[in-house]
From Swiss-Prot:
SUPFAM superfamilies per the UniProt record, alphabetical: Class I glutamine amidotransferase-like
Name by which UniProt lists this protein: Homoserine O-acetyltransferase
Keywords attached to this entry: Acyltransferase, Amino-acid biosynthesis, Cytoplasm, Methionine biosynthesis, Transferase
Site (Important for acyl-CoA specificity): E111
GO process annotations (BP): L-methionine biosynthetic process from homoserine via O-succinyl-L-homoserine and cystathionine
Gene source species: Streptococcus pneumoniae serotype 19F (strain G54)
Length: 314
């Protein structure tokens, strides 16, 4: 799939070396199709790494996507140059009058804080409320999923005894579900978090479908029946070495972290870590774009407001 992004974005050259088709504005303007508009709220500290990870997985269908990156203006990134943010990212005020077919909300390293103590919480709350009428399908990842469930349904997050870090098995629970088309009965994916949600709260407080779960990770992916809300607590987008970098970062900072489970051969951190989730990741993101976004989104974006009323969002 051609993804349409600023040709100066650092991720472009990485993606081109991987034979991923990236299209600039000039070429895209000559294609007589309505591209899908995707907004990515990138809350991860290593912005450029996350950009590349997500764009790589969004490039798996023949559809043309227009990608915009969003950041919280009430938070200043300490790990990404301000020039990068000013060049390639938009603020909520800059996009609030636009309509998007899909949105991805990433994880964030703030799960140790109560939601209300996150410095950009009020701006995040306003953005999520806005998304009900301006975005058709929203994919929430990790902390983004916990925050979305808390704001929409009052589902709490709970501190775990120790960090969940590793590659874990999960079972698919709804045979033939569109998000899991092409999946086997079980799959593995990276998880990296200190907090979890309660399955009982999900069942009692929401009408969401639990689509996958595992013995170590608990609830893994859930979604509304119309696929306008999708919540994933793992990190299918992660690269082979992402968990390794997190482990070495924490070890070097003196935190004595556990070695990520099911990741390094024989738990030897000098070995190259396994990569055993890339096919599942490609399927999942492709299914989201094809079935939750492309098949369902209204051709005219402003129809989303009418759909929001019909689905009970307004």
């Amino acid at each position: 799939m051609p993804i349409r992004i600023d040709k100066k974005l650092p991720a472009v050259e990485i993606l081109r070396t991987e034979n991923i088709f990236v299209m600039d504005d000039q070429r895209a303007a000559h294609q007589d199709i309505r591209p899908l508009k995707i907004l990515i709220l990138n809350l991860m500290p290593q912005k450029m790494v996350t950009e590349t990870q997500l764009l790589r997985h969004l490039a798996n269908t023949p559809l043309q996507l227009d990608i915009d990156f969003l950041y919280m203006e009430s938070h200043r990134s300490k790990t990404t140059r301000s020039e990068h943010m000013e060049t390639f990212y938009k603020t909520f005020l800059e996009v609030k009058d636009e309509y998007f077919d899909g949105m991805i909300i990433t994880g964030a390293p703030v799960e140790h804080l109560p939601f209300e103590e996150v410095d950009y919480w009020e701006e995040f709350r306003q953005m999520l409320e806005w998304s009900k009428t301006h975005v058709y399908s929203t994919l929430h990842i990790c902390w983004g999923a916990q925050a979305g469930l808390y704001l929409r349904y009052g589902v709490e997050k709970y501190q775990m005894d120790s960090k969940l870090s590793g590659i874990y098995p999960q079972d698919t629970l709804k045979e033939g579900h569109l998000l899991f088309r092409g999946f086997d009965d079980s799959y593995v994916s990276p998880h990296s978090r200190h907090t979890e949600i309660s399955k009982e709260e999900v069942l009692n407080k929401t009408n969401l479908e639990i689509l996958s779960e595992g013995p170590q990770v608990g609830v893994s992916i859930l979604a509304s029946r119309d696929l306008r809300e999708i919540y994933s607590f793992g990190h299918l987008e992660y690269d082979r070495d992402t968990l390794a970098k997190e482990y070495f970062r924490d070890r070097d900072a003196g935190f004595d972290p556990h070695i990520p489970e099911n990741y390094f051969k024989d738990d030897d951190v000098n070995q190259v870590p396994c990569l055993c989730w890339s096919s599942s990741a490609a399927l999942f993101f492709s299914n989201w774009v094809n079935h939750a976004v492309y098949q369902e989104t209204p051709f005219x974006w402003r129809k989303i407001x009418d759909d929001a009323s019909a689905y009970g969002y307004l």
